[in-house]
UniProtKB/Swiss-Prot annotation:
Residues 1-22 form the signal peptide. Belongs to the peptidase M43B family. Its EC number is 3.4.24.-. Its cofactor is Zn(2+). Monomer. Changing residue 1033 to V: In SSDA; loss of catalytic activity toward IGFBP3 and IGFBP5. Residues 89-99 have a biased composition (Basic and acidic residues). It comes from Homo sapiens. SMART domains: CCP, LamGL, NL. Zn(2+) binds at residues 733, 737, 743. The active site is at 734. This is Pappalysin-2.
Length: 1791
């Protein structure tokens, strides 16, 4: 309410503010539609009875960032909220800051006076939430061991029998360090190998049967000092920064006191340059670079880890190579991945390889790149994720080697593109190593050969021996890895499907709950009915009889599914609460927000505070007259100025509608829950509330909502339906939602569009309601199968509809069951989320069978997952162990959040949204689940920008800790700059803070910040200028071994076997890595293993069994087993590397060998046999036997401009296969990769467009494209290749195309209308489904588009190749056929052409011409040396292609080709910077061009020639143009201090020093207090000297009060003498200006001065003056303009505000002073008022008021040359032509 009042007061001022940019308006439109869609979801349709259950959710893009998103959760994932202490339970209300920062209570005072009455008995503190999966070393927590049964004596049993020291070695990865002085074949390894090698470590250990001796000698160390390298066994993990006990076991060759030195780059000016003497020559013909990195979340774009860059040209170029992180193509600040770019000196554009998936922040990753002179490849964790053949030859000539530098942490540009994160090792080779080197070195025997190619192993201790800071920057932080290493990931975590929310949606996991009945064992669940009575305990909301009947119905429905309910009733005695109407989804902030909110349209809210309807006219004399007038009781009249909320005047229970009043008659469900503070940790709480629509029966909280087990969770039911006969199934339905069940009609009636990926057409566990035993069905209240329906998505029948299911909308007399899949989901969620609702204290089950991870003849090693709830400690009541990881790290989400920013009137995006775990479903899209500083004014399309100091959000954590990392989820932002956070302030416990400055962030990867601060961290404050930023959550992670985790006891595990172990007892495993090696095994014997968890003396259910025959193959053994149906086996159980954890090929990958080597094959430029039919990118369109494919040879369009949108681009093969969503700059991007319609929309205003339906076209703007084909035939398919699908982000109407085929007689045949989507590119239309077209011979295709934003790159036609039918169709009579819009595809007359004409090609060899049938012939064409193919029609020929196969059919060759001389074209300027090229001989094959430098650049090198080579590229340059400066110019009034500066040929960066002569100083220091005498000028990158001069000393002018009282001999210059005129007999001594720029004495007023100035004239020139000091001499008056908003300025005598020209720039007057002559200075006659500038300069809109010099010409918004979009958008609709023109005299238009 306070927000709204402030906005109303400010409305007149804000109304003058301009909008943000055009894209800003689009952003708000999307956000506003989100709010309206949320309203729509919450305002229920007719017959709706369930609120939250009906809410449509979009598929989540990043489930790993959400609560319960993966199982088991990674160390980098985030914990669930733990309950607050008991002191929090007593609070009856929460407070939020108002705009002044004061707390405003949300709960009325009379509710806070009696907290006991609200709560009844205070429940016990909730048991803690469970923690993460066990992934760290648990040395902190106790024995890391295994033993038999419950005995404490250790008995030898395989790995379990190893003594403690050895056991640790057997369950952790060992770091080994050695030298390469005497290399051995089995020890030659570089970098760290892929994690799959861990499997071999285990196999070897099992064979040896003992500790350290079992470590394979094949594994090599990490680089240490010179020429040392290490195999990947596992990624490193840093110890705490204070050097505490770590997590590495050191081998005998490793000094544990030293550790492994690594670098941490903070992302701020920490680039390192390799010293030239370290590496004689950087490899240029072939190389391999390997690096272990641990990147932070949030990076520069791009962020360079390492690279080789040009150090001679001083211009930004792609020459060299770079390895780093960047956003995916056309993705903005999202989808960041590892990349490898490379550009030889022969080409002008780099080739960029991008990884197949996002990088993982905070995870050690092995990244490698190779180049062999032809093939470049990128490897991530040993998998080849991208490759290319686009570059060839050496990187540079030998002469240019001196111009290349190796950098770490950034590139050589001014921006730096700094990397942020850890760099562990860097290894450099002079050869391109094979993929096996990165994965399976133990099988690789070329170690000695490779060692000779090793040229650099980076050493970081001491770092300055090999590296030096680049450009005077600083060294990165040096850290040391010590101690034991956390166990690496063995199994990829289970994740939900695309349409899922949690791991209970994972098909593999939920199938176990379906098939293994012990997981669905008996569960007794507690629930609590919250029954509110009056103060005397009378008049409860629901009766005891209602409660009894409902309880019986609940148990009757669930008990047959092993779920029973335990009832408790919580009575609240509070008359105030009892007499208030509680409304679902109607927050007080919505009342009177100038927008009718249907959910608040209730009589007791005054019909939304008058927003929905007014009761009549309110007369002013009725307000505040001691009576409540219904017509005045609204927000517009301030609710009768308080009369209607005065208990002395009216019955406030019926008349008080003011949302700010503590007496109001209504409250929201959220306020009720806030007042009661009933935590949902131990109970499912049942509340009662009404709704505006009486048919709302209930609302529930999803189990994945972050409020599910807080005081804001539970179920809200209508008391009118609760426990009433015929309505008891309503609560059963809502409980189903709480336990994770969707409506059975989800995916049919609940879907976003016809293309919704979660649409359900057949029963499925991955779409719809995620249950395969509930058939798709529409929403219906009829107790029968629904009738077939026909809607916009087509005609659909619904056989087997589950209308009797509790999750349908049928009545109680019809619903009677849950399906087995639904029962499995409910049991899963009870274990995953609600385990503390049960009486049982036993651990939750392990729902996945154990898995085999190692096997020898004598042993078998198994691994298992933790309990599904993630329990890693005993659940001690009241402890914080649920927030601890196994290394003693304590992690916590935000506890309280606040912002001084005024809240949006919609009630969304409040600071509270940033409390708790992240819950935004779709990162990078606007969401209602995040905080945003956006304030929108309804009806004005205006958002209020952040103030000059920025918008801020303060986030506080409950427990201050010694912090290690801060994680921040910034899920959406609008600013183009990545640094949307211009400052991040870390708040410390001692009230101090540390400012980190700006940080780069992505919207789909959380921002992680490594904290190096002293003291305990208590919170963080972030600052931004982006008013549309959205922040979802923040997580604070402590350093290991936190005192808050010191008392936590880990869970133990019991391993059961059938047949039993020799002792007859289960094996108890206490170590945290959940592994066990069984050495009591016999080959060929079948064994069954089960694991159960033990905690607090209780045993959980045994896991589903693993059945394995010892010696049999298994997934992960590195051998592809056909018997198991394996498609690959790379030796691990990790997905995302090409071979999934179930040994299936992943999409886009191919795997070869054993263990499998996997690589991405799509787009690598190589057409392999297995992809010939499927890969259009590598192999082109596959033409089946019996068909012919042809590309369009001619094209016509409705809108064509041969320069802007040439339609010829759609002929031939597509120039690009990349399809993207539409953005306005796409049609202007060069080079064009496709045709875009030239629809004249530039002059169309925003209002014009808003009146049209989304994506629609006006009649005159209809877009059509007609393409013609040379060879008419019977059409079988049409292929349409898209450049863009025309879909604008935020819009949902899919663009379409309607197709017509035109036959040889000119008749059109419709093929229907099809949606366009980049997900289906090319769009393939199967013509065989259209019988009316099959036997017509198609000559052209007409395409009509629904949107002008579509881009087409090519169209292809597939026809039947049957000769008998196609031969007569090759021609058409001249007088036949119709054309479209006057454009004809008729291209030749009829005539008999049965024989193939001879191929007579110059400069070509015709070889192997063979006849393949009557009228059919094939010829292979090869051009001579120095010639290349060129096509005049037909398919697109690759540049410099020399061979082609031509086919002749019915006398017609399929292509017209010729062999033309290779022409390299004029050399691109990027080949040699600052050079001119002279090509007097031409630019064809073997011709030469000379190189000359553009002054002042000087030629370096002896061979200034380029030669055109056979591949169409120029030879490598062997010279460069070095920018040098001549001798610097003479500096007047200065003496040169460095004599060598008088010479010529100064390198860029050279500094010359001068000393200014006495009485002069450096011009740049004129504004500073200290006047510098020493002048430095630098040779700049343009080959010119920096400007510099020495200027005379000038003293400060005397204060204005002395104006007109002094006379000076030479102004205020050096040695000038000034005399004050005081009219005294005694003459005053002169005051001198000294060479220091100071007066010899202070100017003082004459002693005899008296009197005062006359009062300034009132309102002269519309200015009035405020004279608080009076009018005496020296008094100051402040000018104020009578008409705001205006500024007082000083104008010349002959100029007024009306005659002021736009190019004049007057000076603003801050004050006037009464001088000693009793006159005002400046003269008030010269002070005028002109209109103030609006605070929207440089916002993308041309504001006419700002288009003048005084306002800096609106920051460039009114000139196309100064706009990034190059398009001026006038803000005012009636903008005068002159006002909106480009007036800036400095703009290009006015030069």
């Amino acid at each position: 309410m306070m927000c709204l009042k402030i906005l109303r007061i400010s409305l007149a001022i804000l109304a003058g503010w301009a909008l943000c940019s055009a894209n800003s308006e689009l952003g708000w439109t999307r956000k506003k539609s989100l709010v309206e869609r949320e309203h729509l979801n919450q305002v229920l349709l007719e017959g709706e009875r369930c609120w939250l259950g009906a809410k449509v959710r979009r598929p989540r893009a990043s489930p790993q960032h959400h609560l319960f998103g993966v199982y088991p959760s990674r160390a980098g994932n985030y914990l669930r909220p733990y309950p607050v202490g008991e002191q929090e339970i007593h609070h009856t209300g929460r407070s939020k800051p108002d705009t002044e920062g004061n707390a405003v209570s949300l709960v009325p005072p009379d509710l806070t006076e009696n907290p006991a009455g609200l709560r009844g008995a205070v429940e016990e503190p909730a048991a803690p939430w469970v923690g993460d999966s066990p992934i760290g070393q648990s040395e902190l927590l106790g024995d890391d061991d295994a033993y038999l049964g419950n005995q404490r004596s250790k008995e030898s049993l395989g790995e379990a029998g190893i003594q403690k020291g050895s056991a640790m070695a057997a369950t952790t990865t060992t770091a080994i360090f050695t030298t390469l002085n005497e290399p051995k074949p089995e020890t030659q390894r570089r970098g760290w190998a892929k994690s799959r090698q861990r499997r071999q470590v285990w196999k070897r250990r099992a064979e040896d049967g003992q500790g350290d001796s079992g470590i394979s000698s094949h594994f090599q160390p990490w680089p240490k000092h010179s020429l040392k390298h290490r195999v990947k066994k596992s990624p490193p993990e840093e110890s705490n920064q204070n050097g505490g006990e770590g997590s590495y076991r050191e081998a005998e060759t490793f000094n544990s006191q030293v550790g492994l030195p690594i670098l941490y780059f903070s992302g701020r000016r920490e680039r390192l340059l390799l010293r030239p003497e370290v590496l004689a020559e950087i490899p240029r013909e072939a190389f391999t670079v390997e690096a272990w990195v641990k990147p932070e979340g949030g990076q520069n774009n791009p962020a360079i880890i390492a690279g080789v860059f040009d150090n001679c040209s001083h211009t930004v170029s792609d020459k060299g190579w770079a390895l780093g992180i960047r956003s995916g193509k056309d993705k903005g600040k999202r989808d960041a991945r590892f990349f490898f770019s490379l550009c030889t000196d022969r080409v002008k554009k780099a080739t960029i390889l991008i990884s197949h998936s996002r990088y993982q922040p905070g995870t050690w990753t092995h990244v490698a790149a190779t180049y062999d002179g032809r093939h470049m490849a990128l490897y991530v964790d040993g998998t080849q994720v991208a490759s290319s053949l686009d570059q060839s030859g050496p990187l540079n000539s030998p002469f240019m080697a001196s111009c290349r530098s190796l950098l770490l942490g950034g590139d050589s540009s001014e921006d730096g593109h700094y990397f942020r994160g850890h760099l562990g090792t860097l290894v450099f080779w002079s050869t391109a190593l094979p993929q096996s080197h990165f994965q399976h070195s133990s099988q690789h025997s070329s170690g000695e050969e490779e060692a000779t190619d090793l040229v650099l192993t980076a050493s970081f201790e001491p770092v300055n021996t090999e590296w030096v800071p680049f450009r005077d920057e600083k060294y990165p932080r040096l850290e040391v890895l010590q101690g034991f290493e956390p166990e690496p990931e063995i199994l990829s975590p289970l994740q939900p499907p695309l349409c899922g929310q949690t791991v209970c949606d994972n098909v593999e996991l939920i199938s176990q709950y379906n098939g293994y009945w012990p997981l669905r064992g008996e569960k007794v669940i507690r629930y609590q009915v919250v029954n509110i009575c009056d103060d005397e305990g009378l008049n409860p909301i629901v009766s005891e009889e209602q409660i009894r009947l409902q309880h019986e119905a609940l148990n009757e429905a669930f008990s047959r599914y092993n779920i029973s309910w335990q009832l408790s009733v919580h009575q609240v005695h509070n008359s105030t609460l009892r007499h208030r109407v509680v409304l679902v989804n109607c927050e007080p902030s919505k009342i009177g927000n100038d927008h009718c909110d249907p959910e608040c349209e209730h009589p007791l809210t005054g019909y939304d505070g008058g927003d929905c309807r007014l009761q009549g006219r309110c007369y002013s004399w009725n307000r505040r007259d001691g009576l409540c007038h219904v017509e005045c009781n609204n927000m517009l009249n301030d609710f009768d100025d308080g009369d209607c909320c005065d208990p002395q005047v009216a019955d406030v229970r019926k008349t008080c509608f003011d949302p700010d009043s503590p007496k109001r008659a209504y409250m929201s469900v959220k306020e009720l829950k806030e007042a009661l503070q009933l935590n949902s940790t131990h109970f499912l709480n049942i509340y009662f509330a009404s709704s505006v629509r009486e048919d709302l029966a209930g609302a529930a909280t999803w189990p994945w909502d972050k409020d599910a087990v807080t005081h804001l969770g539970g179920i809200v039911l209508s008391p009118a339906y609760y426990g009433m006969p015929g309505h008891t199934d309503t609560m059963i339905h809502e409980v189903g939602h709480v336990l994770g069940l969707y409506h059975v009609f989800k995916g049919v009636s609940e879907r976003e569009s016809c293309n919704d990926p979660c649409k359900e057409t057949v029963p499925s566990m991955e779409t719809g309601d995620l249950c395969a035993d509930t058939a798709p069905t529409p929403k219906s209240e009829l107790c029968r199968e629904p009738e077939p329906t026909s809607d916009t998505c087509g005609f659909t029948r619904f056989p087997g509809a589950p209308f009797t299911n509790y999750m349908s909308y049928t009545d109680d007399n019809c619903t009677d069951n849950f399906t087995p899949n639904q029962v499995a989901r409910m049991h899963c969620y009870l274990d995953l989320v609600y385990q503390q609702w049960t009486e049982s204290r036993k651990p939750t089950p392990i729902p996945i069978p154990p898995m085999v991870i190692g096997q020898t003849n004598k042993s078998l090693t198994i691994h298992w997952l933790p309990p599904i709830s993630g329990v890693v400690y005993d659940r001690a009541s009241g402890s914080l162990c649920g927030a601890c990881t196994e290394d003693g790290t304590f992690r916590q989400y935000v506890h309280t959040a606040s912002s001084r920013r005024v809240c949006d009137s919609s009630g969304y995006w409040t600071p509270e949204e940033a409390v708790g775990p992240p819950d935004v479903d779709q990162p990078c899209e606007p969401s209602l689940q995040a905080w945003s500083p956006e304030v929108h004014l309804y009806h004005m399309n205006m958002t209020v920008p952040c103030p000059t100091e920025g918008c801020s959000l303060e986030l506080l954590f409950q427990h201050p800790v010694q912090a290690d990392t801060l994680t921040l989820w910034v899920t959406s932002f609008f600013m183009e700059s990545s640094q949307v956070l211009f400052d991040t302030e870390i708040l410390l416990e001692n009230k101090e803070s540390v400012h980190l400055g700006p940080l780069d962030t992505f919207c789909d990867i959380p921002l992680t910040i490594k904290l190096h601060v002293d003291g305990k961290v208590s919170g963080v404050k972030v600052y931004t200028f982006d008013e549309r930023i959205e922040i979802d959550a923040a997580l604070l992670t402590s350093q290991p071994h936190s005192p808050l985790c010191s008392g936590c006891r880990p869970v133990r595990y019991q391993v059961l076997r059938d047949p039993p172990f020799a002792s007859g007892l289960p094996v108890v495993v206490t170590h945290s890595h959940r592994k066990f090696t069984d050495v009591e095994v016999t080959p060929g014997q079948m064994y069954q293993y089960q694991v159960l968890a033990e905690a607090g003396g209780e045993l959980g259910e045994a896991s589903p069994p693993l059945n394995h025959i010892h010696g049999a193959p298994y997934c992960g053994d590195g051998k592809v087993s056909e018997r198991l149906g394996e498609e690959c086996d790379d030796g691990d159980l990790v997905s995302g590397d090409g071979c999934s954890k179930v040994c299936e090929l992943e999409e886009g990958f191919n795997c070869v060998g054993e263990p499998s080597l996997c690589y991405m094959y799509e787009g690598d430029g190589i057409c392999e046999p297995f992809e010939r039919k499927t890969s259009i990118v590598d192999c082109g369109i596959y033409t089946p036997k019996g068909y012919l494919d042809q590309w369009a040879t001619r094209a016509y369009s409705s809108h064509e401009d041969k320069k802007k949108c040439p339609v010829s681009l759609v002929t031939g093969e597509p120039h690009s296969l990349i399809c993207t969503s539409y953005h306005p700059d796409l049609p202007n991007h060069r080079p064009l990769t496709g045709w875009f319609p030239c629809v004249a929309s530039e002059n169309e205003t925003q209002d014009d467009r808003s009146e049209q339906p989304e994506g629609s076209l006006k009649k005159e703007d209809e877009v059509w494209l007609k393409v013609c084909f040379n060879r008419p035939g019977e059409a079988r398919a049409i292929f349409i290749f898209l450049t863009t699908d025309g879909l604008v982000p935020g819009e949902h109407q899919q663009p379409t195309v309607t197709l017509y085929l035109t036959d040889v007689r000119g008749s059109n045949h419709s093929l229907g209308t099809y949606g366009l989507s980049c997900q289906h590119n090319p769009l393939i239309i199967n013509v065989t489904h259209h019988q009316n077209v099959l036997f017509h011979h198609t000559t052209s295709v007409l395409l009509n588009f629904s949107s002008p934003r579509v881009g087409i790159s090519a169209v292809a036609l597939r026809t039947s190749s049957r000769i008998g039918l196609s031969a007569p169709s090759n021609c058409i009579s001249e007088d036949e056929g119709q054309n479209h819009q006057g454009q004809s595809c008729i291209h030749r007359p009829c005539g008999k052409q049965d024989s193939c004409p001879s191929l007579l090609l110059d400069h070509a060899d015709v070889v192997n011409c063979t006849s393949i049938g009557p009228g059919l012939m094939k010829c292979a064409i090869t051009c001579q040396r120095g010639f290349a193919l060129q096509a005049s029609s037909g398919q697109y020929i690759r540049p410099m292609q020399k061979e082609i196969l031509l086919t002749c059919s019915s006398g017609h060759w399929d292509q017209n080709v010729s062999c033309l001389p290779v022409d390299c074209g004029v050399p691109d300027p990027s080949l040699v910077n600052y050079a001119n090229f002279s090509c007097s001989e031409g630019t064809k094959f073997l011709k030469r061009c000379s190189i000359s430098c553009v002054p002042p650049a000087k030629l370096q090198g002896l061979s200034p020639w380029l030669t055109c080579l056979e591949d169409g590229l120029w030879s490598l340059p062997e010279v460069y143009c070095k920018l040098e400066c001549d001798a610097p110019p003479i500096i007047l009034n200065a003496n040169l201090l460095l004599p060598h500066c008088l010479q010529d040929n100064h390198d860029v960066g050279t500094i010359c020093k001068y000393e200014c002569k006495p009485g002069y100083y450096v011009a740049e220091s004129a504004e500073g207090k200290v006047r510098n005498k020493l002048l430095k000028i630098q040779c700049l990158e343009g080959g010119i000297w920096e400007q510099g001069s020495c200027i005379p000393v000038v003293c400060e002018p005397p204060p204005p009060v002395f104006e007109g009282m002094y006379e000076c001999t030479n102004g205020f210059s050096l040695d000038s003498q000034c005399v004050l005129n005081c009219n005294q007999e005694r003459e005053k001594l002169p005051i001198l200006c000294t060479k220091e720029g100071l007066w010899t004495q202070e100017f003082k007023l004459c002693e005899n001065l008296q009197g005062e100035c006359p009062p300034p004239p009132s309102e002269l020139n519309s200015v009035e003056y405020k004279c608080e000091q009076g009018y005496g001499i020296g008094a100051v008056c402040s000018p104020l303009c009578v008409i705001p908003p205006s500024d007082p300025v000083m104008l010349p005598e002959n100029i007024t505000a009306d005659t002021l020209e736009h190019w004049m720039e007057p000076v603003k007057v801050q004050s006037i002073v009464c001088t000693g002559r009793r006159q005002w200075h400046p003269d008030p006659v010269l002070v005028h008022c002109i209109q103030s500038c609006e605070p929207f300069q440089a916002d993308g809109w041309c504001d006419t008021i700002n288009n003048r010099a005084y306002c800096h010409y609106d920051g460039g918004d009114c000139c196309s040359s100064t706009l990034s979009s190059k398009k001026v958008i006038p803000f005012a609709a009636d903008c005068d032509l002159d006002e909106c023109t480009c007036r800036d005299p400095k703009a290009e238009e006015n030069q």
